[in-house]
């Protein structure tokens, strides 16, 4: 399958290339997602630039990406809650990465069904930034009816 891989650390437009890699092996708790959209987040850009080498050492070449949306095309025996053909989105675990590929195997517990009223692109853009926003609001103790100011966006 095709995968967008980081070949060496550097500039975003100079160190990535499409390579053929093996299709992921589906474990019993996994669903195999045919990728329709994947996001590149600030953490991916920091990894590409080499800024996180000390914290996240990864062997190169590496398939990056944490956020994905697509269609379930296979599932393990213990992957409850999903059927072949389900439209889904997910954030893969920190140690996994690899959503910038044609397929990604993800533990079913990290996957959700895609809301029907959003596109694959919108769904792929939600997991990491949505989690960050939610954690931030929870951290500062925002409650129902509190007012906040959101800059930009």
Each language-model region and where it sits:
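Hydrophobic alpha-helical segments typical of transmembrane helices
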Residues: 5, 47, 56-59, 68, ...
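Residue-level signal for nonpolar/aromatic packing positions in well-ordered secondary structure
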Residues: 3, 70-72, 85, 114, ...
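Cytochrome P450 core scaffold surrounding the K-helix E-X-X-R motif
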Residues: 43-49
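Glycine-rich beta-strand-centered segment in the early N-terminal region that forms part
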Residues: 22-40, 52-95
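Conserved hydrophobic/aromatic beta-strand scaffold that supports enzyme active sites
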Residues: 18-23, 69-71, 103-105, 111
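Short N-terminal binding/cap micro-motifs at the start of the first secondary-structure element
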Residues: 10-16, 42-43
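NAD(P)H dinucleotide-binding glycine-rich loop of Rossmann-like/cofactor-binding domains
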Residues: 90-153
């Amino acid at each position: 399958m095709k995968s967008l891989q980081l070949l060496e650390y550097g500039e975003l437009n100079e160190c990535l290339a499409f390579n053929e890699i093996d299709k992921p092996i589906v474990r019993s708790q996994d669903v195999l997602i045919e990728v329709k959209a994947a996001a590149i987040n600030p953490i991916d850009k920091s990894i590409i630039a080499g800024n996180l080498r000390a914290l996240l050492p990864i062997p190169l070449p590496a398939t990056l990406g944490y956020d994905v949306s697509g269609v379930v095309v296979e599932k393990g025996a213990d992957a409850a809650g999903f059927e072949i053909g389900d439209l889904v989105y997910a954030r893969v675990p920190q140690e996994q990465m690899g959503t910038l590929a044609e397929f990604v195997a993800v533990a079913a517990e990290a996957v959700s069904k895609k809301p029907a009223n959003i596109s694959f692109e919108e769904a792929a853009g939600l997991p990491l930034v949505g989690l960050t926003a939610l954690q931030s609001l929870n951290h500062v103790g925002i409650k129902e009816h509190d007012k906040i100011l959101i800059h930009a966006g």
